[in-house]
């Protein structure tokens, strides 16, 4: 009887040990799985196009990062780029969870991955989307503007055979819009004809940013160039004409920062111009929870953000920089849906 009792006691001890080990393993397994499945401790990466990646835009990027961090409780990392495609692919792949893209860049990103969705964009002066646009411009050096005169105004009639600078093949206002205008104006088959040296233009170059394209023109490397207003006008003074109209003349400021420090005092004249839908901030919705998306959108479209001078800059202040010009007290970020970009 004593042998049986001893065996029972040994079996009981063994079962207790197994159960205890199972409990430990279960707890460890749950803990491990919980850590792997949680991404709330990871930083949110926000990618910016080359035009907003320059050193003088750092305060603007930091202001956006701070708002997102306060809204989500997560750290934020800023990703700057020197290539439009890199920014688009970062958002498409999920390497970046948010991005500030041009309208064309957003459409391309959404076509590659429908989980990339626009969230909010800058409003018009009335705080609405009714006239929420900026401008794509085709410009020439003012000293050569007479070559493009058409009566008492200017036109793009004589750009054929000239050297031309675009921003990037994925830029909305630096390629898609101006190339569409040129194709339509000259009855070309497609914009592909604009990309090869000697086909339509004598030579074609890319600035890789709106600033770079403008410098290509002002330095004399290109006879004509496409670039927008919102990414470069803080470096210029309006010399004559109405802002963003054909015939308007702009001059690089005497104290303009790089890359315009090499072309200070140079002037350009607008010979073609087209309005463009404002650029959106976008989410990769696979990488941010719905609650996080809502929290960020609410924070970025708030009155506090609209009053943040690091993001919404005063156009009357020659030294001010930011992502969006504060056209009025009503200028702010407003929520936007994918369908708003259908015209692109």
Segments (PLM) and residue ranges:
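A bilobed periplasmic-binding-protein/Venus flytrap-type ligand-binding module shared by bacterial periplasmic
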Residues: 50, 133-149, 272-290
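A conserved helix-loop-strand patch within extracytoplasmic ligand-binding domains
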Residues: 122-186
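C-terminal motif of bacterial Sec signal peptides marking the signal peptidase cleavage site
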Residues: 25-29
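Bacterial signal peptide processing site
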Residues: 31-33
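Pocket-lining segment of extracytoplasmic ligand-binding domains
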Residues: 171-289
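An extracytoplasmic/periplasmic, membrane-proximal ligand-sensing/linker region
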Residues: 41-44, 48, 52-63, 287-344
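Beta->alpha turn/N-cap motifs
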Residues: 48-50, 82-84, 95-107, 111-115, ...
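Short, well-ordered beta-strand elements
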Residues: 38-53, 74-80, 162-165
